[in-house]
Design a protein with these regions (language model features):
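Non-heme di-metal
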Residues: 1-214
Length: 214
């Protein structure tokens, strides 16, 4: 895929620079945190299932693990989500929030609980499909390293959860086979916007004023 080829080149540039690499990891951590936060904010306690609570805990654990890797690589200056220690953090969150808004609006005619459940399920399915692709390319660029090994565990969990959420969607939405293609197209367009922003940012990159651990 053209976008994969583009991302491979960007990842090569990122992992060659410890400061950029730490920001990259921190941005992944931030997105996992955004997912964790959104699950807790969107789900009413009365309908919060063990599966959804488990997913929230998984997102929080991934956010923490990636944060620790960012701090280990970049130093204490990366122990926050300040804009200067993220890599296109605003654009990455916009991808997530815009996708969430699209899915929510797509089910505006449903009951409140069904709308929340379907929007959550589709956003999760779309984001985890993308995450598996991006994390997979990233892991391939790392060789046999601590970060690659930790990503392997994360990928295994994401793969299992993607399978579970897809089975849930196929059972809950009779229109899944057609709706999923429409939603994939929207997600891909939003991802391309983020990828363009990342390409531009790396082309203009100058050293970040953060002490990087030696």
């Amino acid at each position: 895929m053209p976008s994969d080829n583009c991302l491979e080149g960007l990842i090569s540039q990122i992992v060659a620079d410890p400061a950029l690499h730490a920001r990259w990891l921190n941005t992944f951590s931030y997105l996992e945190y955004v997912g964790f936060r959104k699950i807790l904010k969107s789900q009413r306690a009365e309908v919060l299932t063990a599966a959804i609570l488990g997913h929230a805990c998984e997102e929080g654990r991934h956010a923490l693990g990636l944060k620790k890797l960012a701090v280990k690589l970049g130093g204490a200056g990366f122990d926050s989500y300040a804009p200067q220690v993220l890599l296109c953090g605003e654009e990455a969150e916009a991808y997530f929030q815009d996708l969430d808004q699209f899915c929510d609006e797509a089910f505006a005619d449903r009951s409140a609980d069904e709308r929340v459940r379907l929007a959550y399920s589709y956003v999760t399915w779309l984001v985890e499909r993308r995450a598996l692709d991006v994390y997979g390319l990233y892991k391939s660029a790392l060789g046999d390293s601590e970060i690659a090994r930790k990503l392997g565990g994360l990928l295994a969990e994401e793969t299992k959860h993607l399978s579970d959420i897809e089975a849930l969607l196929q059972a809950a939405d009779p229109a899944f086979s057609t709706r999923s293609k429409e939603f994939e197209s929207v997600e891909n367009s939003l991802y391309e916007v983020f990828l363009a922003a990342l390409t531009k940012a790396l082309a203009q990159e100058s050293p970040v004023k953060v002490a990087v651990a030696s």
